[in-house]
Amino acid sequence: MRSLRALLVLFAFVFIVVLTPALRSQAAAASPKTPSSPQLVIIDTDIGDDIDDAFALALALKSPELEVLGVTTTFGNTQMRARLVDRYLKAVGRSDIPVLAGPETKTGNLMTQAAYAKRDPERKFGDGAEFILREARQRPGQITLIGIGPLFTVEAAIKRDPATFKKLKRVVIMGGSVYRGYGLNTQGKPKPAEPEWNILNDPPGLKALLSSGVPVFMMPLDSTQVPLESQGREAIFAHGSALTDQLTLLYHEWTGGTPSHSPTPTLFDPVAVTYTFRPDLCPAKQMHINVDARGMTSPGQGSPNAEVCLQSDEKSFLDLLLKRVTAD
């Protein structure tokens, strides 16, 4: 009996010392890995025209993998865009995030969500390009810049201090059209490549970025034309949180400001945000991208100057966005 008891004690000791760590390591390998600390990101946006920027910002704020260091605005009336972001962040309890404005540019584009912005007190917002450079200087090799608008603010930062701009970890942009243009043709097939809005408005900005020495990741029209259909919209608008209430307000201003457009948003910009922490949903490959004066972004010969996602996992992306944005 004593020998049996001794064998049981020995077996228990072996299980605890030898097998338990192995089982733990197997469980850790089977579970998805999460980063020990969030990625540091700055978002540069032309929020206030189309509605996808508002959804992109919501997704970034609700993703624990990201720490938003600041939001800069680009294109047209950047001070008004900054007021929109400022009100949005205050409403969702994130007034700790700095808001800055990039250089103002001439534009005939209608800011569909200006009424929302004008409810925020008018003030002078700081220099967006300088903010990007200051943060890159203070945290070299750590910051991802997410560009989801025309690249005027990015271009201004590059021109002002190219050496400091190179201290960014990488730049992820929504922009370009490699093989596919906007929408479908009458036969239901993707239209051929055409100038995409963000690059059309500032071709020199993309040229400067691609030659800046910072790794560039492009999410073009090929991978970002993901519609948010009525079922998904209704789930967001009925949720009733501070964040989804802002999306509801901005969505209705957008549809009211563009009555001739479809009420279905296309989530171009949230794909770029998602790529920063779930690159598996939009696998990128190395390419050499040429940019012409019209804003065409075509594949060419030469050393790769960008990693480009040409196809995204739309269902998984939408599932993730809806889950994150409606999480309490």
Q: What does each model-found stretch correspond to?
A:
Residues 1-6:
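Positively charged n-region of N-terminal signal peptides that target proteins for export
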Residues 78-84, 177-181, 291-305:
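Short, mixed-charge aromatic SLiMs
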Residues 35-38, 55-62, 67, 197-200, ...:
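Conformational coupling and interaction surfaces
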Residues 81, 110-112, 182-185, 229-231:
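Short, well-ordered secondary-structure micro-motifs
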Residues 34-45, 51-83, 120-218, 224:
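Active-site histidine-anchored catalytic micro-motif
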Residues 20-32:
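Signal peptide processing junction and immediate N-terminal pro/mature segment
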Residues 8-22:
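Bacterial N-terminal signal peptides
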Residues 33, 37-39, 43, 79-138, ...:
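Metal-dependent C-N hydrolase catalytic cores
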